[in-house]
Amino acid sequence: MNGNKDAIFKALGDSTRRLILDELSERNELTLYELTIRLITKYDLSITRQAIAKHLSVLEDAGLVTSKRKGKYRVLIFNNEPLKNLLKGWIE
């Protein structure tokens, strides 16, 4: 579990990754293109889809983001279970 905790904290340690999670928690099941457009327009970020894909890889390694095929698109899904499990140990 410690390795997973480290991965979660690493993932949350970057402001862009936190914005990605904010967007996915607000509107789950976004494509990479939709997520990129939302980040650029809402937060005035200067970021490419390739850079977002790298951030998503870190979030996926931490278990915070998963993806699934929906038709011809791959949609991104926020998974808050790792955060709940992490906090459960400290709060309970």
Swiss-Prot record:
Please give the SUPFAM superfamilies that the UniProt record associates with this protein.
Winged helix' DNA-binding domain
Q: What name does the UniProt record give this protein?
A: Uncharacterized HTH-type transcriptional regulator YuzN
Biological processes per GO annotation: regulation of DNA-templated transcription
Report any Pfam family annotated for this entry: HTH_20
Q: Which UniProt keywords apply?
A: DNA-binding, Transcription, Transcription regulation
Q: Which domain of life is it from?
A: Bacteria
Q: Name one GO molecular function term.
A: DNA-binding transcription factor activity
Residue ranges constituting the HTH arsR-type domain according to the UniProt record: 1-92
The record ties this protein, via Gene3D superfamilies, to: Winged helix-like DNA-binding domain superfamily/Winged helix DNA-binding domain
Q: Which residues bind DNA?
A: 37-61
